[in-house]
């Protein structure tokens, strides 16, 4: 990728804390991955960033799962997309609590 895409997959006014680096990182991860992307989010602060239903701040499908289930969920989703011959990106994205604290 030589240029940053203009498309936004995180809408303005998320529920993130002011100056949250995790939401900024996720913004650019999604720009790199593109619109054909599914997020798997374990219980962590990232599930707060997305907002409260029905007012989500994400423009991609999101699956919230338990801490220990994120990798298995993403693996199963990737296999299902592969069997359907789809090249959908499946990304597990977690905040610091979902990554190293638990």
Predicted segments with their positions:
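Cofactor-binding active-site loop characterized by glycine-rich and histidine/acidic residues
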Residues: 1-102
């Amino acid at each position: 990728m030589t240029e940053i895409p203009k498309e936004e997959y995180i809408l303005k006014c998320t529920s993130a804390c002011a100056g949250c680096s995790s939401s900024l990182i996720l913004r650019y991860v999604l720009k790199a991955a593109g619109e054909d992307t599914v997020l798997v989010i374990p219980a962590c602060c990232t599930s707060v960033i997305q907002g409260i239903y029905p007012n989500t701040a994400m423009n991609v499908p999101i699956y919230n799962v338990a801490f220990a289930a994120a990798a298995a969920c993403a693996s199963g989703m990737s296999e299902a997309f592969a069997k359907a011959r789809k090249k959908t990106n499946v990304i597990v994205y977690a905040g610091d609590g979902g990554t190293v604290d638990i």
